[in-house]
Amino acid sequence: MPEALLEVNHLKKYFPVTKGLLNRTVGHVKAVDDISITLQPGETFGLVGESGSGKSTVGRTILRLTDKTAGEIKFKGIDIHSLSPAELRKIRPQMQLIFQDPYSSLNPRVRIGDAIGEALLDHGLCSKSEVRDRVFEALEACGLSSYHIDRFPHEFSGGQRQRIGIARALVLNPELIIADEPVSALDVSIQAQIINLFSKLQQSRGLTYLFISHDLSVVEHLCSRIGVMYLGSMMETASRDELFKNPLHPYTKALLSAVPIPIPKLKRERIVLKGDIPSPVSPPAGCKFHTRCPYAQEVCKSEIPVFRDAGNNHFVACHLV
């Protein structure tokens, strides 16, 4: 097996909760609590879960936009969090992030040609005379025309702005792209176009994606493997086909039951979860999902389930499986 492009081992990210004039730490928000992920070159791994499950924090911590609390993150065998700022800067172009909101991720006062080409100059990847050609290439790869280069963000639609965001990541020729809810702010018809663009770029450039989303119907079209997060922990991981055909964790089953079926005559039994997602400051003892699980037993309230292989490379953290 080839060397993994990205290895995340037992990653934890806790944010301190402070109180009083002296900002005394009184607790921690356990945004990410013992997550492990491996991505092979050319693979797309989908990370799904409700809002507040810690998906985006995983992505930001992998890119070292925020420091980890514990665990290990290796990119091409290099421990990201052990690098000095100068060493990290050298590999930054190889790892890029696509933001969720195409409206706020672009500076309204900066022409898109400058927004896309700025990183090329910052990293010294080409001369000033070559920037424009590199930007043209990135724009055209993302379905935009070269004459758009001197326009401002307000002159584009939401879908076009997201294409600009993709071009900004693509211009550095990265190997890994972390896409944080890249289609959630777009209309459904535009979502399909952007998903197809991601697939096309992966095939032509050999990109590796960590695709973060709350929508299982979106990751089904793009991802080869899927991980389901809840309250900072991984509940289940499996290949796309295995997860959709044979979901094992009650939380995964509930998420899948909410995915619309395109055939009106077919009906899926809806699993409605009770209550709200608990606070990550004081998560429940035992299985974090037991407060909302319709099948919870006494063991679920006291013992943390082991994340284990249930067969066919299908991993799940549940006492009932």
Task: Label each residue range with its predicted role.
Residues L22-T25, I80-Q96, D122, E242-P247, ...:
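ABC ATPase NBD coupling module
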Residues G71-D79:
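Conserved ABC transporter NBD signature motif
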Residues D79, E130-Y147, K253-S257:
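Conserved ABC ATPase "signature" region
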Residues F152-F156, Q160:
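Conserved ABC ATPase signature
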Residues V171-E175:
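A short, proline-enriched helix->beta-strand linker immediately N-terminal to the Walker B motif
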Residues I178, P182, L186, I190-R268:
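P-loop NTP-binding/switch modules centered on Walker-like glycine-rich loops
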